[in-house]
Amino acid sequence: MESISLKAHAKINLSLDVIGKRQDGYHEVRMIMQSIALHDEVVIEKRAAGIKVECDKPWVPEGSGNIAYKAANLMMERYKIESGVGIKILKRIPVAAGLAGGSADAAAVIKGMNELFNLNADEAELMDIGKQVGADVPFCIKGGTMLSEGIGEKLTKIPSFEGVNIVLVKPKVGVSTAWVYSNLKLNEISSRPDTELLIKAIYEKNIGCLAQNMTNVLETVTIKKYGVINDIKNELLRLGALGSMMSGSGPSVFGIFENEKQACLAYEGLKNSEWECFVTQTI
């Protein structure tokens, strides 16, 4: 096998709580993460030497500035791969959007290289490498519905929440995760998610309960600077969403809809706006 193609799925947060800040500067989180159907296409191929990263979108860094390059480099060092690797990314997930697009690409590179070079590494090994690349990469390797704790590396599987209809909206701003966390004041968080209630709703497939109780503590920081996030949340609710929330550090916002028809109607109502819009599903 000389090449392999993988789907790199985006993620949303169904909740996001920040518990505290560690001495090393990292924040302790407790959040529910969910894969969605929206994805990049990542093609990995063997080449004579070196690592080459290419992307069909000019604003996505190529070469060593791309997280996928870092993932490939770590794989080559860990498993002493002597030949080279070429990585082509067909970008569909918006960048700097709180959707783990870069992490998803890196996870695809780790999984793809394991298969392409017949490394036979188990998932735990791959996740260990992923952890060195970025906090969201281990989740992107596993995918599905997960409770994420620690700095994002402790993952506990939750029953699948697949097939839920989502409308995803990305305004024309990019948000730095580092900036959001550095401006988060833990003593000013007034509303935290009831994570146990949300997990119970997932177990019971109670979409309404989950949608109405989703909470992301980072919204307080990001919305203060980008009021458009609140506008999108309100617009999704006006168009029939059962609930809406910012994903990750933003600025993407999603709404949960009762059925595909309602999601498509909301998408039609939004798609001619100045925002990027997607109709998708949890997987």
Swiss-Prot record:
It comes from the Bacteria. It comes from Acetivibrio thermocellus (strain ATCC 27405 / DSM 1237 / JCM 9322 / NBRC 103400 / NCIMB 10682 / NRRL B-4536 / VPI 7372) (Clostridium thermocellum). InterPro entries: GHMP_kinase_C_dom, GHMP_kinase_C_sf, GHMP_kinase_N_dom, IspE, Ribosomal_Su5_D2-typ_SF, Ribsml_uS5_D2-typ_fold_subgr. Catalyzes the phosphorylation of the position 2 hydroxy group of 4-diphosphocytidyl-2C-methyl-D-erythritol. The active site is at K11, D136. Keywords: ATP-binding, Isoprene biosynthesis, Kinase, Nucleotide-binding, Transferase. PANTHER family: 4-DIPHOSPHOCYTIDYL-2-C-METHYL-D-ERYTHRITOL KINASE, CHLOROPLASTIC (PTHR43527:SF2). Gene3D superfamilies: 3.30.230.10, GHMP kinase, C-terminal domain (3.30.70.890). The gene is ispE. This is 4-diphosphocytidyl-2-C-methyl-D-erythritol kinase. Pfam families: GHMP_kinases_C (PF08544), GHMP_kinases_N (PF00288). One of its GO terms (biological process) is terpenoid biosynthetic process. Belongs to the GHMP kinase family. IspE subfamily. It catalyses: 4-CDP-2-C-methyl-D-erythritol + ATP = 4-CDP-2-C-methyl-D-erythritol 2-phosphate + ADP + H(+).
